[in-house]
């Protein structure tokens, strides 16, 4: 079992398999060149697999595959199948912008993937283009429908941006509710790679907008996980991921493996442990040591709620959010 210095059990790893992305979202990597490549830095998937086997043996119960955009990584379905075959009890999930999901959903499901989380920031094509610099809405919606068709569990993630998509909060809620999908609204997390004009809505503002139509009952916050779950009077549940709140980090149960082999204890802080050499060499003893050290290195909380703190400099496409 992996336990950090604040007695939090760490049983969840987010694994970035690439920094590449086919979107250039305002809140993530708007200025990154479209011909950006990271192939020379990437860990081979077979080596990532061996690392994750060790992590599973140490108590990891959930693995999320992220990017960049993970569906750009070749051989991903085979990688998932091998991971699933090693331990079928481990929950395998994937975060995606959904652009390539329609043609890959069935193979991902057959490989053993349990769930996809799809970014959906708007239901208006022009806004999706403005936010992501990609004419992507049709592809993303088709990917969502195909995922439901093949039997994948699904969640939607929406980053709420002031004066951009905040007037769609209820419309997006209805879209998700009608498909029996949970939507999670995400507070914008300030970072130096985002456009400077991007401003997000906080949890209270999001709730106030939803309360204009629905009576909201706050459900119990999960003992582990980042999302506060709210229940509407009709029983539908949605989530809010609010990193600016004081209790956001209390139940944190995760670490991150970047695509270049660095283990990141926290999304906010730049600190990381370079495990690339150990992973490439499949050095089990050293991997275990570095894994445990990264867990010990986890800070108590982020500093997004501290107005005097520095804006995080690590790119979210590096760690997968």
Swiss-Prot record:
The name this protein goes by in its record: GTP 3',8-cyclase
One GO term (biological process): Mo-molybdopterin cofactor biosynthetic process
> Gene for this protein?
moaA
Function, as annotated, reads: Catalyzes the cyclization of GTP to (8S)-3',8-cyclo-7,8-dihydroguanosine 5'-triphosphate.
User: Quick one: which residues bind [4Fe-4S] cluster 2?
Assistant: 249, 252, 266
Keywords of this entry:
4Fe-4S, GTP-binding, Iron, Iron-sulfur, Lyase, Metal-binding, Molybdenum cofactor biosynthesis, Nucleotide-binding, S-adenosyl-L-methionine
**Which residues are noted in the entry as GTP-binding?**
14, 64, 95, 155, 254-256
- Report a single Gene Ontology molecular function: cyclic pyranopterin monophosphate synthase activity
Q: Which PANTHER family match?
A: MOLYBDENUM COFACTOR BIOSYNTHESIS PROTEIN 1, MOLYBDOPTERIN COFACTOR SYNTHESIS PROTEIN A
The protein's annotated pathway: Cofactor biosynthesis; molybdopterin biosynthesis
Q: Which cofactor does it need?
A: [4Fe-4S] cluster
Q: Which residues form the Radical SAM core domain?
A: 5-233
What the record says about family reads: Belongs to the radical SAM superfamily. MoaA family.
């Amino acid at each position: 079992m992996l336990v950090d210095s604040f007695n939090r059990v760490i049983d969840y790893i987010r694994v970035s398999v690439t920094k590449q992305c086919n979107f250039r979202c305002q809140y993530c990597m708007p200025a990154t060149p479209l011909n950006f490549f990271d192939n020379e830095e990437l860990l081979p998937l077979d080596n990532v697999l061996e690392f994750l086997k060790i992590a599973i043996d140490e108590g990891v119960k959930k693995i999320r595959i992220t990017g960049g955009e993970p569906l750009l990584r070749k051989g991903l379905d085979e990688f998932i199948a091998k991971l699933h075959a090693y331990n079928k009890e481990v929950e395998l999930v994937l975060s995606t912008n959904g652009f390539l999901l329609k043609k890959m959903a069935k193979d991902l499901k057959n490989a053993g993937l349990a769930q996809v989380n799809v970014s959906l920031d708007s239901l208006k094509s022009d806004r999706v283009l403005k936010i992501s610099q990609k004419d992507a809405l049709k592809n993303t919606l088709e990917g969502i429908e195909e995922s439901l068709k093949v039997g994948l569990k699904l969640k939607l993630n929406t980053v709420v941006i002031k004066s951009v998509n905040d007037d769609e909060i209820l419309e997006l809620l209805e879209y998700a509710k009608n498909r029996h999908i949970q939507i999670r609204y995400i507070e914008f997390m300030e970072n130096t790679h985002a456009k400077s004009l991007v401003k997000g809505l906080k949890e209270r503002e999001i709730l106030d907008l939803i309360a204009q139509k629905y009576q909201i009952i706050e459900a119990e916050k999960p003992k582990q996980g980042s999302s506060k779950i709210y229940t509407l009077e009709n029983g539908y549940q949605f989530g809010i991921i609010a990193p600016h709140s004081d209790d956001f980090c209390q139940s944190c149960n995760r670490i991150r493996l970047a695509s270049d082999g660095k283990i990141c204890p926290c999304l906010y802080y730049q600190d990381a442990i370079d495990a690339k050499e150990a992973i490439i060499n499949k050095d089990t003893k050293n991997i275990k040591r570095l894994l445990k050290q990264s867990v010990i290195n986890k800070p108590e909380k982020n500093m997004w709620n501290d107005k005097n703190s520095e804006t995080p400099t690590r790119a979210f496409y590096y760690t997968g959010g």
